């Protein structure tokens, strides 16, 4: 009985120490103008990224593994930043791949093509040639890249990026208001540990 009490006390102290490990203002920040969340009881996590970002390429395996381990109370999505014309083209490529249901391996192939093969996919022609490798005819790629639906998504993402003041990638947004970003000396695993910490704080029963 006494041993069990000590065990409970130890676990409580351990949990508190873990929770106190990360602090608002030092390890993560809060935005001035948060985005509204869509569903009560669901913690929304968004990765702001760009295919041309070397850090995003390195982060991709870790964030994908992390996302696959989340339960039903966490919603995860990626948001390609549409800053410049090249960013917008890559963002349109991201949504085209999703719309055509080409799967995660195609997103990985984009990163590899850019960062390993040196093809930056900075023109529609190069993107059309790239997607031909996945059985997509150039005219179909054109239709999707220039579709009203995808342009709407780019406009939405541009608005959200401005509102959240996203200035670098990769960057994680939790529940539309908490920002976890890459910092010198911070590993990607540490970044995800901070995200986990913020998620736990945001869950209804926390």
PLM regions: where:
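C-terminal cap of thioredoxin/glutaredoxin-like
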Residues: 133-206
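Conserved strand-to-helix beginnings and helix N-cap segments that scaffold or border functional pockets
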Residues: 57-60, 87-91, 185-188
């Amino acid at each position: 009985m006494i041993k069990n009490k000590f065990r409970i006390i130890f676990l409580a102290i351990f949990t508190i120490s873990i929770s106190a490990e990360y602090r608002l203002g030092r390890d993560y920040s809060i935005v001035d103008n948060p985005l509204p969340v869509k569903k009560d009881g669901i913690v929304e996590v968004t990765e702001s990224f760009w295919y041309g970002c070397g850090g995003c390429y390195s982060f991709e395996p870790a964030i994908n593994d992390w996302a696959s381990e989340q339960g039903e109370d966490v919603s995860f999505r990626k948001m390609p930043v549409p800053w410049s014309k090249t960013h917008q083209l890559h963002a349109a490529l991201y949504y085209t791949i999703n719309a055509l249901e080409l799967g995660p391996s195609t997103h990985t192939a984009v990163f590899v093509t850019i960062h390993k093969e040196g093809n930056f996919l900075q023109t529609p022609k190069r993107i059309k040639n790239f997607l031909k490798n996945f059985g997509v005819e150039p005219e179909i790629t054109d239709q999707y890249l220039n579709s009203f639906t995808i342009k709407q998504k780019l406009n939405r993402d541009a608005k959200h990026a401005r509102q959240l003041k996203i200035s670098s990638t990769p960057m994680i947004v939790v529940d539309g208001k908490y920002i976890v970003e890459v910092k010198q000396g911070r590993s990607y695993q540490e970044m995800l540990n901070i995200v986990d910490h913020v998620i736990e704080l945001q869950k209804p029963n926390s």
